[in-house]
Each structure stands twice: as structure tokens, then as C-alpha cells.
Amino acid sequence: MKVTLFIPCFVDQFFPQSGMNIVKILERLGHTVDFPDAQTCCGQPPFNSGYWDEARVVAERQMAVFRDAEVVVISSGSCGAMVKVFYPELFHGQPQEAEAKALAAKTFEFSDFLVNKLGVLDVGARFPGRATFHDGCHGLRELGLKKPPRQLLQHVRDLQLVEMKEAETCCGFGGTFAVKFPMISTAMGEVKCASVAETGADFIISNDSSCLMQIRGILDKQGNPAKTVHLADVLAQT
């Protein structure tokens, strides 16, 4: 299968190794991977801030870039939800609605693609350590991705997966929320990191890099040596 990658801004700018590891995993499974250079932001920041006209401009560009893709895989539940759930809403009743729905139908968050599209649970990974998983809000609530990441992690050799208390609670990032309400954002993050600390985990894993960046910053401030790791970075290890 030819898989086209939709790489979120945070991965592109701050965590490119996570995108490269998705390529590594998909090629290990026998798939061809394509990365269109013309892709850009999914448009979520203006959409969430109420600038829907501006968000449509960005979304239209993305729809054009991925128009001919067989299947689109994205390394973020947040950006994945933007495409799968909110693109059709953004263009509801407009000429581009059909194209928005078409892109939504062929777009998958990475763990969803592996488990529910390909039927793969074991990618041959080995990652020694004790880890806990953080559910990003959009991936969990908009895409329903509670099980797929955990199913994949349960098949990673030498990985001890422990559930943190209230794993589904927001880390406090929320995109522009962290900028508009920094004190609330930090307080929410501190609650999340307290749950992390209780597990005694060496690693905090998530399928959203933005959540991991928020958690990493607070853990560093608290002096907690636990490391944040994207799901793809775990699954790429052998």
C-alpha cells in the first residue's frame, strides 16, 4: 500500500524523528511511504480561535495536496481530529464539503491505521522500561482512540505498561489555550504530572507531541527524570 504522511507542525518543527520513525515502521511492514513537500498546517489554531475563514484557506490547500493520496496517515490525534471531524464541519453546506469528507474518510491517526486498518498489533518492537500512556483529548474524545495505542504497546517486548490515574485528563496544553490561559494550563499540567509520578514510570508515552512537550516542560521544572516519548519512537525500536 502507498501511504501518504501528513506531518503535524509540532512534529515537523520540534520532533522530526517521530515522523521519520513512522516511515521506518511502515516500511518495515512492507508499505511505500510518500511525503508531499507542499503540505502545511492543518488549520486547527485559527479554527479553534474562531477564525474559520482563515482556517478554510489552509484546509483547502491541504485538501488539494492530499487529493490523490490512497490513504493518509497522521502522527497526531489532535490534527487527525481536525481533518476527520472538523474539516467536514468547516465546509458544511459549501462546494468543498464532498472533498473534505473524502479526505476525512481516508485519513487515519497512526495507531488507528496500524490496528484498525491494517490489523497489526505487533510491529516487532522492543523497548525496555516502565511506561505510562497519556491520552490526548482529541484522539480520545473525537476519534475514540483509547484502545489502539495500548494494544500496540502491550505487544512491545520488555515494556511494562502501567495506567496512570485519570489517564484521560487533559494535560493543559490545548494549543492556543496554553497561550491564552497560561496559569490554568500550568495548573492542569501539574495535576497530570502528579499522576505520572505516582506510577513510577520511566517513560510517558503519547500519540500527540504537543501533549508531550507540555508534560516534559513541567516534569523538568519538578525535577522528575522521567522521559516523554512519542508512540512512534517506541514502536520503531527493535
What label would you give each PLM region?
Residues 1-238:
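Iron-sulfur cluster-binding electron-transfer modules in prokaryotic oxidoreductases
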